[in-house]
């Protein structure tokens, strides 16, 4: 990958990579080409007001949390990256987080600034630009006839999507979702890849895949694991959400939606029961405040242009 990136650098003014693609930074340093990092999660850039990846939201502990987090990153990446950068004659790696995983030129955080305004101490090189989504006409989709009929045949359903997280405990995920649907007495569209069920079963319709951006606006609420994609899908659809985080990263997304006023408190997957999830669904469906706030947030997010902001910053980074 390093050699391939060196070839890319030879014909590029700026190279963009994910924060974890440290070989991109190495190749750019070797070539003298500016590099930018893309982050789909806002909890990787140090700030006094934001907890690090996986840490609790205790603001007074954030400086200590970031020091510990930096040490964890050193243990995970430090030895390998230090050896590699040294072998290429590149600047010495002192801290893997700041010297390898972050760009000293431009970090693009693909998160809605409506949901997560940039912390005041981030400075100009860390930009919350908005999520990257194609225009609707670039991703045309219409539901299959049976799903279209289901969507029109009664009250708007609740959309359930745990993404790839459901594979961590497929049976538990299935029992939790179907039990919650029964407890909440709602119609539901359930997205589960690899599920045995497909099509309509009473008030539930099973799909293996459907684009959240197009399907969510046809639903009353979303029950999601809280990844970047599903979080922004709920936000753009203007519907309230119940976040059921499987891992610690997803807890932050759940807290952000709750803080924004469009979601109930997160309900961790490993503690959730059909009864508790069903009650949480009824809570969001019955809350006019959550529905109104979700609609207002969607209007604000619709005015964002994450791709356009990112392109503008990258163009400014290119040599003149």
Annotate each predicted stretch with a short phrase:
Residues 1-64, 114-115:
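Conserved nucleotide-sugar donor-interacting segment of glycosyltransferase catalytic cores
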Residues 8, 62-98, 104-111, 125, ...:
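Nucleotide-activated sugar donor-binding and catalytic core shared by glycosyltransferases
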Residues 15-16, 36, 159, 189, ...:
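Structural detector of well-ordered beta-strand residues that form the stable sheet scaffold
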Residues 17-19, 162, 224:
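Short His-Asn-centered micro-motif
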Residues 31-34, 105, 186, 239:
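A short helix->loop->beta-strand "cap" motif at the edges of active sites that frequently abuts
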Residues 41, 194, 247:
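Residues in the short beta-alpha loop(s) of Rossmann-like NAD(P)-binding domains
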Residues 45-52, 137-140, 216-218, 252-254, ...:
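Short, charged, surface-exposed secondary-structure boundary motifs
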Residues 114-221:
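Donor-nucleotide binding loops and adjacent catalytic segments primarily
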């Amino acid at each position: 990958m390093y050699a391939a990136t060196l070839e890319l650098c030879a014909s590029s003014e700026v190279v963009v990579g994910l924060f974890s693609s440290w070989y991109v930074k190495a190749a750019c340093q070797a070539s003298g080409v500016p590099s930018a990092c893309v982050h789909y999660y806002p909890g990787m850039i140090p700030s006094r007001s934001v907890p690090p990846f996986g840490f609790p939201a205790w603001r007074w502990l954030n400086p200590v949390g970031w020091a510990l987090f930096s040490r964890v990153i050193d243990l995970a990446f430090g030895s390998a990256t230090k050896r590699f950068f040294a072998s290429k004659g590149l600047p010495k790696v002192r801290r893997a987080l700041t010297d390898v995983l972050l760009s000293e030129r431009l970090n693009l955080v693909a998160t809605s600034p409506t949901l997560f305004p940039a912390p005041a101490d981030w400075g100009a090189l860390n930009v919350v630009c908005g999520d990257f989504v194609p225009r609707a006409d670039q991703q045309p989709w219409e539901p299959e006839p049976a799903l279209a009929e289901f969507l029109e045949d009664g009250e708007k359903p609740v959309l359930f999507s745990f993404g790839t997280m459901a594979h961590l405990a497929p049976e538990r995920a299935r029992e939790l979702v179907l039990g919650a649907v029964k407890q909440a007495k709602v119609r539901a569209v359930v997205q589960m890849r690899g599920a045995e069920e497909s099509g309509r079963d009473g008030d539930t319709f099973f799909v293996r895949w459907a684009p959240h951006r197009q399907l969510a606006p046809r639903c009353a609420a979303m029950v999601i694991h809280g990844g970047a994609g599903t979080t922004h899908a709920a936000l753009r659809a203007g519907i309230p959400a119940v976040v059921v985080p499987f891992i610690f990263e997803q807890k932050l997304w759940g807290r952000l939606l709750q803080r924004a006023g469009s979601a109930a408190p997160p309900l961790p997957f490993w503690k959730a029961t059909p009864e508790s999830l069903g009650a949480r669904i009824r809570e969001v469906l019955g809350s006019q405040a959550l529905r109104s706030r979700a609609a207002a947030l969607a209007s604000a997010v619709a005015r964002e242009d994450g791709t356009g902001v990112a392109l503008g910053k990258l163009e400014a980074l290119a040599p003149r």
